[in-house]
C-alpha cells in the first residue's frame, strides 16, 4: 500500500491478495510492480489501476514477459496443458502445500506454461510440506506419462526443483527416516 498511495487504484484490487502474491519482494521490487501495473493500465486506456493490471504486471515481473513470438504446435499446447494440469491438480488436492493461484499455458520467460501457488507466510516448513511440494513438482511429469505414455523435455525445471528439495530434506534438515539426522 505504501508504494500505491499516489496512484488511483480500482475497487476490485484486494491488497491482501496482492501482498500474498508478492511475498519476498523488496520495497524497490514492489515499487517497480506498482509502476509496471500503472503502465499496463495506461496501455489499456484506463485512468486507474485494476486487479488485472496488477496481475499482468506481477506475472511480467515474477514469471517473465509473455513470449508471443513462441509458436507452439497444437500437440505442444495440449502437452503443456496436461502438464500444467498435473501440477494444478496436485496443488489443489494435497493438503500441506501452498494454495493454487494461477495456471497458464502462455509461454513466459523460459517456460511454456506456469502453475503458480501463493506461498503462505511461514518461518518453518514441515516434512509434509516438502513432500507435497515435491509431489506437485512431479505432477506435470506424471500427467504426461498417464495421458501420453511418455515424457518430453519440458519438465527439466520440475525435476531440478524436486531433486533440490529432496536433497536438502536429507542433507540439511535431517528429514530422512533411512539416513537420519546428520551434522
Regions found by a protein language model. Give the residues of each.
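Alpha-helical structural elements of signaling/regulatory helical domains
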Residues: 9-10, 46
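Conserved P-loop NTPase/AAA+ ATPase motor core
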Residues: 22, 28-183
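Conserved AAA+ ATPase "sensor/coupling" helix adjacent to the nucleotide-binding pocket
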Residues: 1-9, 15-21, 36-41
